[in-house]
Swiss-Prot record:
Gene designation per UniProt: ataP
Organism: Aspergillus terreus (strain NIH 2624 / FGSC A1156)
Keywords of the record: Ligase, Phosphopantetheine, Phosphoprotein, Repeat
Name recorded for this polypeptide: Nonribosomal peptide synthetase ataP
Region (Disordered): 98-119
Disruption phenotype annotation: Impairs the production of acetylaranotin and of the cyclo-L-Phe-L-Phe intermediate.
InterPro entries: ACP-like_sf, AMP-bd_C_sf, AMP-binding_CS, AMP-dep_synth/lig_dom, CAT-like_dom_sf, Condensatn, PKS_PP-bd, PP-bd_ACP
Domain notes: AtaP has the domain architecture (T1-C1-A1-T2-C2). The single adenylation (A) domain in ataP suggests that one specific substrate, L-Phe, is loaded onto the T (carrier) domains of ataP.
Disulphide bridges: none
Protein's job: Nonribosomal peptide synthetase; part of the gene cluster that mediates the biosynthesis of acetylaranotin, a member of the epipolythiodioxopiperazine (ETP) class of toxins characterized by a disulfide-bridged cyclic dipeptide. The first step of acetylaranotin biosynthesis is performed by the NRPS ataP which produces diketopiperazine cyclo-L-Phe-L-Phe via the condensation of 2 phenylalanines (L-Phe). The ataC domain of ataTC then catalyzes the formation of bishydroxylation of cyclo-L-Phe-L-Phe.
Classification of source organism: Eukaryota, Fungi, Dikarya, Ascomycota, Pezizomycotina
Pathway, per record: Mycotoxin biosynthesis
Region (Condensation 1): 163-429
E.C. number(s) listed in UniProt: 6.3.2.-
């Protein structure tokens, strides 16, 4: 049995059995997923069992064979098919398909062969069409012509008759080609018609160019069918083109292989062999799918988060209105991979992956660029034939499936690791290649990739696809077996864009598969002792000869480093022996030295002197003293040791301290070190005759710089003496200092110094000015990981300090978060690239993968780049400005925060001397010193200087901060401090006031009371401005005192708010009970007075209404509905109001009779809703009821949306049998009319609106119209996720979008936009009938140049701050206008002419009576120059109505504004960089605009509860 398996594996891999290396894995020998599937099927036929998963994983062949077991026939065993030909088609992914989420219909019981073969019975058992076939058919029905394959190949004219006959025999033998796909209401079914519609057309063309044109013509059908065409060229009697147009539901790439092979066999004279019945295979496959459904659902559930978060939208400009080409087929771009197939196969074998995984990994890399995301979604074409169904690998028919796969592109991951991960994903995905979308996924990807292997009989040219097909997927990629890539693209993409995609793809694939002259000169000097270059050479030869007997090339050798001659000899001896030098400071703690030695992987420890061997690490295998080795050399008279190091080999290993205290060993190469020191200035001006001081720590790479600069270029290295480590500075030309050391030294003490290099720390201006006046002063920047240094700058006194420009052999990039080059002046992370970049960290591959990766900017050099973690930018002179580390820059709940900057700002607060801030999940933890600091006071001070999202949730005064073993702040321990301090804090530790406030918060925010702590923030917990108003009312009622809205906005936490309430109660600002003031019933409110002014002299006042309309069905009792309305209108005196002129003012007059509802036969809503009101003579409420419609229209002078909802709620109660609420508070007794603006609030508005812009357009009347659109669904879904995770309100988001839409071409934003202010200040006000709503101006200001790395969220944050400031200082509208000295000139609105409103799902009008369906309506006219009204429907859709004055805006202008708003919403939610945001808004202006009518649109009277 095992011999049989071995033979089959060898045959499948095309390897002689005797040469099969069974110690390797299947993939290492060249196997892939399809060959594994084929091998499993072949073994089944001969009674052997293998698993595809075993074959694809990195398991030796011998282990697979030893674990295999035979399969023995029983009564229920699988039949052994007669066809045992092992040569199955080598394809599973060949044709690009058009997926659809439509699920397949239900199937019935198992059919018998008789019923399957029945052709004259219409009652045969129904076999469900496989889901993918059904989706292809449905897609074609929706878009005729889609999913029709055009397959062509060239055939000899002499063979044409036999070929035609062979095609006919093969198609007639296969059941799929006589199958009808019957679509019924309950699903789709396979029906055997008993007839094969075999059609051929013959066409002759004059030349080959015409042949190509004929071949590319549209098929003669556009539905589910197939036909053949033979195209010949006149005068050419050699070949013909056979063209087969066939719908994808009949055949997939796998089946095409089978069909072509069968046709070839019949042409060769073999009898035709019918394959298994497709209906039978489909039915049995469907049964197994049902059995495994739970497994599939679990798998897709595990993938849900990744798939939902992955990006698939290609961020390239598209023409959404691109005209359809006169050509039927989508265009195809062709590319050739410049890597040999054998090289790819070898690569895949070495790393135990498959070649397709390389292609999928490469395309994922491309998507990460063109989708601007590190998590991308792509479509994977699978055979759908992995299930154990008899005949599934032999059946003709379409079983192909296209599945989504999310790939995370981690910038720090090495190439091999990335491809291996993609390979594992593909293997796992292939286990579910049969799973339909109903199991828990959606086919919503913008690109799909398929592999296509050799097709028997195909002799087409290599630069054309053998098949093509139009689909709804924008980008379809096919990789042919000859390494030609065909990229088929939708019309909305430009060819230049597709060329870029293809070029990136092919490049991504390619990137985955480049002292003797002065022997007596002094090399080194230590006090009176010296060593010549000849001595250094001879002595190091001795060490090298000895080491070479014990180490291999590239082995690390550690040295007990201390400044002496034998130390230098040890270094060069190691390098000559081909080893890697690793210095371990003689002053190291023994335990740390031992740990470093173990990390290095060394076995040998060299010491300069014999007395130092006692310091050998415990882990060392050998220890030798250089002085002993030199004595042996003298005794034995060794010959010269000849060694030429490899340029790419490692030269030295230098340990740097890690952030966790664990040292990192950095491996640097000979090539990098030599390149670094080629420049004279960089190498410390080292040359013969120059003296270079050795001052840097012997274990620091600064000493490497000193040693090799001096000794590689003939200079003398001057070592420090132990007694006076700085005395040698009096006698040298050049040296390296840290700025800290330079600060302690006086330049005048060292007159011989010519060149001083500062490294390791930032240089202060003071140090620069002192030293640059005396010596040539250089500032060098560069971490160990880039071989000593990356940039250099010659500093001058009084000039700004920078780190200069790159060394000649280093490239420096400033990259943004997406790895793109940042413009000059814009901050980003500093990346170092080029030959100097080291080989990473020894023994820490994960850390290496996080920081080192191929150079993505200069891709053609095959070099790497290193992410330094430092932030910097290029200044105006082209110099690099380094600002420090970026490890502490985080994104918290959508906001960027620099924790280091936050620490500095908190440290400057009163009573705080030092602060340390760490992240704990979605919260911040701040430790402050001294321990006596008051956390509550800290929080108050923070609220004054920090945005809400930057205020730590936990503020803990401590005596000392947690530290790591190497003396750094331990931020992990800091975060855990919050767990220790707060884990045992029960809710009953809250004060009584805090507990009551927390209960009210929980109710208003609809959240669990246990989630609210004393440090909770209302906005962070999901609150917004309207909920703050509701909270104010609840608190007023609960505590019987007036809690100003300003207190709610300013309170950072629940504790702060509770303390403020306690103070208000102590002050007894309000009595527990107070009587409404006495007043004249005829008086009118401030807002009523303003509306009267608007009515005066304006005939176009149809927009001055609030309306509600709904559709009624037969379940509604019309008489009871009328009675309910009459009762409610009778109960509220304010609804009888009329307004009459009396002398020089207006007074309220109450009608003797309340308004009553009118029953009419037909309600003409459009006409009725636009009928104006006469304030003096008309009832200002109209309720009209027809058999199918209810329309309520109320003048705005007595009604706002809150009042309308109160009335609807009253009607609902009365309709259900309750009494009307006649005890609602009196309108003129409302708290709102008793308010007087505070001086501080008026002062705020003076400053807030100072020098604000004003609308220049002048209105003639309130005439206008509306345009209504629907926000794209994908934007709505993204908006919902955004609102759940951010602290912005819907209205703030809308304000930001509209501000951008109105000012898209400005460098900075400064505009005043209005918003609605509820103006109801108490619970009583919230239940009062009448007009309260007032306008409130919001000033939107944003200067992107003043914000580092400005992006959409930075702009949103400025909008939020402005919005909160305006609301917290809200004053009566008329007082504000008067205070600012503005005289209203209606119809021009004071202060602003644009209004923005946002009605959320819970804030819309509702009448909960069975049989009523609310309708969307609006009236003609325009209350403002432009009003942008967002309304969320019950199904989640968002409507945007733009009400505008046609005298100011043309329909095209409004259409452009609408497009801008939609675009701005999408970009704000995605938080794109500011320049990208503005750039895409500019593109909107250039797009084709479709202008549609306003109120005549289909949304007028559309249901608000749309499905």
């Amino acid at each position: 049995m095992q011999i049989n398996i071995r033979n089959e594996i060898a045959r499948e891999l095309n390897v002689p059995t005797t040469e099969l290396d069974d110690s390797l894995s299947f993939t290492a020998l060249g196997g892939h997923s399809l060959s594994a599937l084929r091998l499993v099927s072949i073994c089944k036929r001969i009674g052997l069992s293998l698993a595809v998963g075993e074959l694809l994983h990195d398991i030796p062949i011998k282990d697979i064979i030893s674990r295999s077991t035979g399969m023995y026939d029983t009564a229920g065993s699988l039949p052994i098919l007669e066809n045992t030909d092992p040569s199955h088609p080598d394809v599973s992914f060949n044709a690009i398909i058009t997926p659809s989420p439509s699920p397949s219909g239900p199937s019935t019981g198992c059919p018998t062969p008789d019923t399957l073969d029945t052709t004259d019975s219409q009652d045969a058992d129904k076999i469900s069409i496989p889901e993918m076939q059904l989706s292809l058919i449905q897609s074609t029905l929706a878009n005729p012509g889609n999913n029709i394959l055009a397959y062509h190949y060239m055939c000899s004219l002499a063979d044409l008759p036999a070929t035609r006959m062979a095609w006919q025999q093969v198609l007639e033998a296969e059941s799929i080609f006589r199958t009808e796909f019957r679509i019924e209401h309950e699903g789709g079914y396979l029906v055997d018609t008993g007839f094969t519609p075999y059609r051929w057309r013959d066409t002759q063309v004059p030349n080959w160019e015409a042949l190509h044109a004929e071949r590319d013509k549209r098929p003669s059908f556009d539905n589910v069918a197939f036909e053949f065409q033979v195209i010949t060229v006149a005068g050419d009697n050699s070949v013909a083109c056979i063209l087969w147009h066939v719908h994808h539901s009949f055949i997939d790439g796998f089946s095409m292989q089978l069909v072509m092979r069968k046709v070839s066999r019949v042409v060769a004279g073999h009898p035709v062999e019918a394959g298994p019945s497709f209906a039978t295979v489909a039915w049995e496959r469907d049964q197994i799918i049902k059995e495994r459904e739970a497994d599939a659902r679990r798998y897709w559930k595990s993938q849900k988060r990744v798939l939902e978060a992955a990006a698939s939208e290609i961020r390239m400009p598209r023409c959404d209105f691109a005209p359809r080409s006169i050509e039927f087929w989508n265009k195809v771009a062709t590319f050739v991979i410049d890597v040999a197939q054998s090289d790819l196969l070898g690569y895949a074998a070495r790393h135990h992956v498959t070649v397709p995984s390389v292609y999928y990994a490469a395309w994922a890399l491309v998507l990460s660029i063109i989708c601007d995301s590190n998590l991308v979604l792509l479509g994977v074409v699978m055979s759908g034939r992995s299930l154990p169904v008899p005949g599934i690998l032999d059946v003709i028919g379409s079983l192909v499936n296209t599945l989504p796969m999310g790939v995370e592109v981690e910038l720090g991951m090495d190439t091999v690791g990335f491809i291996n991960r993609v390979f594992r994903q593909l293997v796992q995905l292939s286990s579910f290649d049969w799973s339909p979308p109903e199991h828990g996924y959606r086919r919503q990807f913008a690109s799909v990739l398929a592999m296509q292997f050799d097709v028997g009989g195909h002799t087409g040219t290599t630069n054309e696809p053998s098949s093509r097909m139009n689909s709804e997927i924008p980008i379809s990629i096919t990789v042919e077996s000859d390494q030609v890539i065909h990229l088929q693209f939708a019309p909305e993409y430009q060819e230049t864009q597709v060329q870029l995609m293809g070029t990136l793809f092919t490049r991504a694939i390619s990137c985955l598969a480049a002292a003797a002259e002065n022997p007596e000169a002094c090399a080194a000097r230590l006090g009176a002792q010296s060593m010549s270059y000849q001595e250094l050479d001879r002595w190091s030869d001795c060490v090298a000869v000895h080491l070479s007997m014990y180490i291999d090339k590239g082995a690390v050798v550690c040295v007990h480093a201390s400044p002496c001659m034998h130390w230098l000899v040890a270094i060069y001896g190691i390098l000559k022996a081909g080893g890697v030098y690793c210095p371990l400071n003689s002053k190291l703690d023994p335990e740390l030295r031992n740990n470093m030695f173990q990390s290095s992987g060394a076995a040998i420890y060299l010491t300069p002197s014999a007395s130092e061997t006692k310091y050998r690490p415990r882990a060392s295998r050998y220890v030798w003293a250089v002085e002993d080795l030199l004595q042996r050399q003298d005794d034995n008279n060794q010959d010269e040791f000849d060694h030429i190091p490899r340029a790419e080999g490692n030269a030295y290993l230098c340990f740097t301290s890690g952030s966790t205290g664990k040292p990192k060993g950095v491996l640097c190469t000979h090539r990098g070190l030599v390149a670094f020191q080629r420049d004279l200035e960089v190498r410390l001006h080292a040359q013969p005759g120059r003296r270079i001081a050795q001052t840097m720590s012997v274990s620091f790479d600064g000493s490497i710089h000193e040693i090799f600069s001096a000794l590689s270029y003939g200079a003398t290295l001057v070592l420090p003496t132990p007694e006076d480590p700085f005395s040698h500075l009096y006698d040298v030309d050049s040296c390296i200092f840290t700025p800290s050391l330079a600060a302690t030294l006086d330049p005048s003490d060292y007159p011989n110094l010519c060149y001083v290099y500062l490294v390791g720390e930032q240089v202060t201006q003071d140090i620069n000015d002192r030293w640059a006046a005396s010596v040539a002063l250089y500032n060098m920047y560069g971490p160990t990981e880039a071989t000593c240094g990356a940039s250099i700058k010659c500093l001058l006194p009084g000039r700004k300090v920078t780190v200069g420009r790159p060394n000649p052999t280093t490239r420096i990039y400033i990259l943004d978060r997406n790895g793109r080059l940042a413009p000059p002046g814009v901050m980003g992370q500093i990346y170092l690239a080029g030959v100097q970049v080291s080989n990473g960290y020894i023994g820490q591959s994960d850390l290496t993968n996080e920081r080192f990766f191929p150079d993505s900017i200069c891709c053609g050099l095959g070099e790497r780049m290193y992410a330094t973690g430092d932030i910097g930018y290029w200044d105006g002179d082209g110099d690099l400005i380094c600002l420090g580390r970026n490890d502490r820059q985080i994104k918290l709940r959508g906001f960027r925060l620099d924790l280091d900057d936050l620490e500095v700002r908190i440290s400057k607060l009163p009573g705080v001397t030092r602060a340390a801030v760490s992240r704990r999940g979605d919260d911040l933890v701040a430790l402050v010193q001294p321990a006596t600091a008051c956390a509550a006071d800290c929080r108050k001070h923070m609220a004054a200087v920090l945005p809400t999202h930057a205020i730590p949730r936990y503020i803990i005064p401590v005596e000392r901060f947690p530290m790591t073993p190497i003396g750094k702040l331990d931020y992990r321990a800091i975060a855990q401090t919050a767990d220790v301090r707060y884990s045992a804090t029960p809710s009953n530790e809250m004060s009584p006031t805090e507990q009551r406030v927390a209960a009210i918060w929980a109710d208003i925010l609809n959240m669990d009371r246990a989630q609210i702590s004393r440090d909770s923030n209302f906005l962070a917990a999901g609150g917004h401005s309207l909920l703050q108003l509701r909270l104010a009312g609840r608190l007023n009622r609960a505590f019987n005192c007036s809690v100003p809205i300003t207190d709610l906005v300013k309170a950072a936490t629940l504790r702060d708010l509770s303390q403020r309430i306690d103070k208000l109660q102590e002050q007894a600002c309000w009595k527990a009970q107070r009587l409404p003031p006495k007043m004249d019933k005829r008086a009118i409110s401030r807002m009523e007075r303003e509306w009267i002014s608007k009515y005066e002299g304006n005939t176009s006042n149809t927009s001055f209404t609030v309306s509600f309309a709904c559709r009624l069905d037969s379940a509604v009792d019309l008489a009871r509905l009328k009675q309910s309305w009459d009762s409610v209108m009778e109960a509220h005196q304010v609804l009888r109001s009329r307004y009459c002129a009396c002398a020089e003012r207006y007074e309220r007059v109450f009608s003797d009779h309340a308004p009553v509802a009118q029953r009419i036969a037909e309600c003409r809503v459009l006409e009725e809703i636009n009928r104006p009101f006469d304030l003096a003579n008309d009832d200002l409420v109209r309720v009209v009821i027809s058999p199918d419609t209810l329309l309520v229209t109320i003048s705005h002078i007595i009604c706002d949306l809150t009042t309308m909802q109160l009335l609807l709620s009253d009607v609902e109660r009365v309709y259900d049998g309750a009494e009307p609420l006649g005890h609602r508070p009196m309108y003129m007794a409302a708290d709102a009319w008793q308010r007087v603006a505070a001086d501080a609030d008026l002062a705020f508005w003076t400053s807030y609106l100072q020098d604000c812009p004003h609308s220049k357009a002048k209105r003639e009347s309130y005439a206008g119209t509306s345009r209504v659109g629907i926000v794209p669904r994908e934007t709505v879904l993204a908006l919902e996720d955004f609102m759940r995770s951010s602290q912005f309100s819907h209205h703030q988001l809308a304000l930001a979008a509209v501000a951008l839409a109105l000012k898209p071409n400005h460098d900075r934003i400064d505009s005043v936009i209005g918003g609605p202010f509820l103006n109801r200040w108490s619970e009583a006000d919230m239940n009062t009938i009448g007009l309260f709503l007032e306008p409130l101006p919001f000033r939107i200001q944003f200067d992107p140049k003043a914000v580092p790395n400005a992006d959409a969220h930075a702009f949103l944050q400025s909008v939020k701050c402005s919005s909160q400031a305006a609301i917290s200082h809200a004053v009566p509208w008329q007082e504000l206008v008067c205070h600012l000295g503005v005289t209203p000139e209606f119809p021009n609105h004071p202060l602003f002419e644009t209004m923005v409103t946002f009605h959320t799902k819970g804030g819309g009008l509702s009448l909960q009576i069975d049989g009523i369906e609310p309708l969307y309506t609006w009236s003609e006219g325009a209350k403002f120059g432009l009003m942008c009204e967002f309304t969320t429907l019950s199904n989640g859709d968002i409507l945007l109505r733009l009400e505008y004055d046609q005298g100011i805006y043309a329909p095209r202008d409004i259409s452009i504004i609408e497009n801008r708003i939609m675009t701005a919403l999408r970009l704000l939610i995605k938080n794109v960089p500011w320049l990208d945001l503005i750039g895409e808004l500019h593109e909107v202006d250039g797009a084709t605009v479709c202008v549609t009518p306003g109120h005549k649109g289909s949304l007028f009277l559309s249901p608000l509860k749309r499905t």
